[in-house]
Amino acid sequence: MKLVSIFLLVTIGICGYSATALLINRLPVVDKLPVPLDDIIPSFDPLKMLLKTLGISVEHLVTGLKKCVDELGPEASEAVKKLLEALSHLV
């Protein structure tokens, strides 16, 4: 049952991606950009809502990442710094 569900989700995802790739060059180009979702619903943040649903505190996550950046090497710390920057906007 789980295997069938996963297969269906992957198949739908591939078909949706193929349809988007096929239609992307046929759609007219819009000069005016649409209104960002942040202006319409300022309190709606899907990442923060997902973390809250999982029971993960964003503040604790940010402080833990700051400690990680201090202990990592230069290559790995760049990736963690980018993640920390993205999460800092949620606090």
From Swiss-Prot:
Tissue specificity: Highly expressed in lung where it localizes to epithelial cells of the trachea, bronchus and bronchioles (at protein level). Expressed in club cells of the bronchioles. Also detected in the anterior and posterior lobes of the pituitary gland where it may localize to gonadotropic cells (at protein level). Not detected in other tissues tested.
Keywords from the UniProt entry: Disulfide bond, Secreted, Signal
InterPro entries the UniProt entry points to: Secretoglobin_3A
Chief site of localization: secreted
Leader peptide range in chain numbering: 1-21
Pfam families found in the cross-reference section: SCGB3A
Superkingdom per UniProt: Eukaryota
Knocked-out gene: effects: Viable and fertile, with no gross abnormalities. Lung tissue appears normal. In a C57BL/6NCr strain background, animals show a mild increase in ovalbumin-induced inflammatory response in lung. However, in a mixed genetic background, there is a reduced ovalbumin-induced inflammatory response, possibly due to the presence of modifier genes.
GO cellular component: a single term: extracellular space
Entry function: Secreted cytokine-like protein. Binds to the scavenger receptor MARCO. Can also bind to pathogens including the Gram-positive bacterium L.monocytogenes, the Gram-negative bacterium P.aeruginosa, and yeast. Strongly inhibits phospholipase A2 (PLA2G1B) activity. Seems to have anti-inflammatory effects in respiratory epithelium. Also has anti-fibrotic activity in lung. May play a role in fetal lung development and maturation. Promotes branching morphogenesis during early stages of lung development.
PANTHER family reported in the protein's UniProt record: SECRETOGLOBIN FAMILY 3A MEMBER 2 (PTHR34829:SF2)
Subunit record text: Homodimer; disulfide-linked. Monomer. Interacts with APOA1.
Family: Belongs to the secretoglobin family. UGRP subfamily.
UniProt-recorded name of the protein: Secretoglobin family 3A member 2
Lineage start: Eukaryota, Metazoa, Chordata, Craniata, Vertebrata
